[in-house]
Amino acid sequence: MNLKLVFESGDPVLIGVFVLMLLMSIVTWCLVVLRCIKLYRARKGNAAVKRHMRDTLSLNDAVEKVRAVDAPLSKLAQEALQSYRNYRRNEASELAQALPLNEYLVIQIRNSMAQIMRRFDYGMTALASIGATAPFIGLFGTVWGIYHALINIGQSGQMSIAAVAGPIGEALVATAAGLFVAIPAVLAYNFLNRGTKILTQDLDAMAHDLHVRLLNQKDS
């Protein structure tokens, strides 16, 4: 099966299908590489943050130690402590009088977690869409190619196996291309989705720890 024959045939639809497959494959692998690097750095940074938070009694000191660490847990700890300080600084305000510290911290920590996780959601929709649509786009290219191959064979009057196998074989490559693009996209989506879930679990655990420590915080 020679892809060169597909492009030499001049069929714009079949050529468009293969070009689209190529673009989808490039997008998939770019997203996979970028997301894997980002998740790796996040896990490595989170491990350092956990270690500092566990080994340091004072929350203020722990947050200062992790301030230079570029990690989701570091950002969450900094924003949670800043929210606590803002509340203590404005305890005389109407908001502080109407909203207990416990509820205020829950709201602020949840908002921080949502903002942090948005940074790790990019590309997932694209991977899911590519994994779901690539096989059907490839199948469309195959159906289109077979249809036009049969028309050309009928017009030429050549009904030999060699005349049928060549054009139809080239059209079937579109289905294989669709699977070649879709399978890595689906596997990458599942792998990255699991990585994101682990990150969410780490954030949940850290949020609970920060909430408890801030409620018992004596210093500001």
UniProtKB/Swiss-Prot annotation:
Compartments where located: Cell inner membrane
Entry's Gene Ontology cellular component terms: plasma membrane
Record's keyword annotation contains Protein transport: yes
Record's function text: Involved in the TonB-dependent energy-dependent transport of various receptor-bound substrates. Protects ExbD from proteolytic degradation and functionally stabilizes TonB.
Keyword entries, A-Z: Cell inner membrane, Cell membrane, Membrane, Protein transport, Transmembrane, Transmembrane helix, Transport
Biological processes annotated in GO: protein import
Keyword Transmembrane helix: yes
Protein name (database record): Biopolymer transport protein ExbB
Family matches, as InterPro entries: ExbB/TolQ_transport, MotA_ExbB_proton_chnl
Transmembrane segment boundaries: 13-33, 126-146, 168-188
Pfam families documented for this protein: MotA_ExbB (PF01618)
Subunit description: The accessory proteins ExbB and ExbD seem to form a complex with TonB.
Species: Neisseria meningitidis serogroup B (strain ATCC BAA-335 / MC58)
Gene from which the chain derives: exbB
Annotated family: Belongs to the ExbB/TolQ family.
Membrane topology value: Multi-pass membrane protein
